[in-house]
Amino acid sequence: MIEEILTHHIIDHKLTYKLFGVIPLSSNLITLFCITIGVFILFTLIAKFRRPVLLMTAIEGLVVFIRDEIVVANFGEHGKKLTPYFCTLFIFLLFSNSLGMIPQMRTITGSISVTIGMALTSLSLIIFLGVKQNGLLGYLKHFVPEGTPWFLAPLLFFLEILGLFTKTAALALRLFANMIAGHMVIICFICLIFIMTAINKYAGIFTAIPSTGLSLFVNLLEVLVILIQTYVFTLLTAIFAGEAYAHH
């Protein structure tokens, strides 16, 4: 029983079937597909409403918040064209982080491979915007500040490149660690009930009450963590991309 709980929430299960006979499938990849299709269908249906509804009003408020507090704050007024990307990133992350709250579903951002993929997407955006705004040579120049002695230039360039990849790694690890931590704590409380029951059934009953209560409390905290980590990942991506975008 304990092994089933651990493997369901933590391990990405590989499937024998391959998409188009080439692409290997896993439970995380299928969940990613489902989230993408689900979000697309949901917002397509919402867009067809002629009259304002509560959900539409909430989404409009979210879009305005992302535009003003994340995009414009880091890119300026001319960066408003990036609002759709950051809205998509925020909503996709929100769904990905929240899915584990549903019974029998899994939080795909609790897999390091998924968070690395998302961080690499952010890295691609940072480099793309930096090169687009400043040109390839101009973008590379900002890694070595003007006035740097020639003998220090290679070292500074290496350190700046290393810093860029370090920030990307931090994005992936921060999201992964925060999303997996809550599930691990809940699993520990649940496993404690089974362990104590195996020792003595009365001890198991006595342990079940506080363990269940603490699990519910951690679940409530997880809702807050989901919102915070979704916002933090989106904001940090905007900050890093804005720094690359701003160099002239």
Swiss-Prot record:
Pfam families (UniProt xref): ATP-synt_A
Membrane topology according to the record: Multi-pass membrane protein
Protein name: ATP synthase subunit a
Bilayer-crossing regions: 29-49, 53-73, 82-102, 111-131, 143-163, 179-199, 220-240
Database matches in PANTHER family: ATP SYNTHASE SUBUNIT A
Subunit structure: F-type ATPases have 2 components, CF(1) - the catalytic core - and CF(0) - the membrane proton channel. CF(1) has five subunits: alpha(3), beta(3), gamma(1), delta(1), epsilon(1). CF(0) has three main subunits: a(1), b(2) and c(9-12). The alpha and beta chains form an alternating ring which encloses part of the gamma chain. CF(1) is attached to CF(0) by a central stalk formed by the gamma and epsilon chains, while a peripheral stalk is formed by the delta and b chains.
Function summary: Key component of the proton channel; it plays a direct role in the translocation of protons across the membrane.
